[in-house]
């Protein structure tokens, strides 16, 4: 899709300014900047979410996963999964409190923007990715293996007890 290029690592919050100033030609924006990039004086040339939707035939975007060593044992892994699920459910059931907390890390963004961003990710798919989420994760790793970006390995997805 893009090919090889020279890249510059930086904090995600520095990307809009680096693009505006010409320090870099392009940047991958994440977090709430995916919603506010226009207000920050930069233009979208590719939406990775839209690209993924197209190539995956509508599977959810595998934004992040929790990776744990098998040596922790299934019981501890399942407990950790359960605690994370309960935390997300609590946030979903207490949006005003979750937003109050999120605003501490909002880097000057409006509460309305942060609410829109939070509601994109505090949802049922975040609690349980389901079959579609598992397919998405498998597809992502299959693509990465095919391109030589990750070594071949056996993907194991923890199932709720």
Describe the residue ranges of each PLM region:
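Short, well-ordered coil/turn elements that cap or connect secondary structure elements
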Residues: 2-4, 39-40
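Helix N-cap/coil-helix junction residues
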Residues: 3, 108, 149-150
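Short beta-strand-to-loop elements that line the ligand-binding cleft
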Residues: 3-12
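Pocket-lining segment of extracytoplasmic ligand-binding domains
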Residues: 11-103
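Secondary-structure end/capping motifs
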Residues: 72-143
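Conserved C-terminal helix/tail region of periplasmic/extracytoplasmic solute-binding proteins
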Residues: 142-161
